[in-house]
């Protein structure tokens, strides 16, 4: 006997699609911002409605049954049509599009012109609001004041800025990973010395105040070695540290992400980049995963999905 769609909770179809994509109850639950138990209950309802197991457990995760495989394309088309329907209001001029970008202003400046052009092509009357990433930015995403954040996180096990430490309500995608390097003027005396940890620590440093902290993973690695750097100046932005390091007769060293080379070339600063004088395991702790962040409630918002994809494409073109 044919069943009526009125007897099916359509929210269950979203759950079904995510299960098909993730092949995992736990991962589907994370994307839906619910507990695995809730997803298991939804799967039980779907099995009863379709009178089919839909998925069976295997060492590789959930394996779809033949019925589920046969429905995959139809389900994807149904979800696409649903998104088009929900996108109708978003084709009206959106107000106050907000981008939350990393504190590293060079990262913002590298993409701002290209991003704004693409955004105005899609939404000609939209507005763009940019703010620097700071200690309150994750809360701003949670409060709905920011659509998307773009922030460098940290990899050191002792860091408070690990991806695994993000609030459960925040979804993310790593766009690229960077390893910081040392920036110094082209005629800096350190360039005439053996480049090692002693030379690195012999000169004064510029530190960046990151989310209300003057220290970061670099200082953690040095502490593990029983060493520390002399911080002569603290600044809020990386581009300011590059500018100061480039000044004539300045002995200051700036440590900033490698991507700052784009900013360097743009402004023709007389700087040279050297690798941090650490071994491979220590360098690994200093990796910075640059990450798009958004609230889970926006994971399927067509405007936000488009924005994420646009930013991803911009950075892919830079690689």
Curated annotation (Swiss-Prot):
The keyword Lipoprotein does not apply. It comes from the Bacteria. The keyword Cytoplasm does not apply. Residues 8-65 form the HTH lysR-type domain. InterPro entries: LysR-type_TF, LysR_subst-bd, Tscrpt_reg_HTH_LysR, Tscrpt_reg_YidZ, WH-like_DNA-bd_sf, WH_DNA-bd_sf, YidZ_PBP2. Keywords: DNA-binding, Transcription, Transcription regulation. PROSITE patterns: HTH_LYSR. It holds the Pfam family HTH_1. GO terms for molecular function: DNA binding; DNA-binding transcription factor activity. Residues 25-44 bind DNA. Involved in anaerobic NO protection. Belongs to the LysR transcriptional regulatory family. HAMAP family: HTH_type_YidZ (MF_01607). This is HTH-type transcriptional regulator YidZ. It comes from Shigella dysenteriae serotype 1 (strain Sd197). The gene is yidZ.
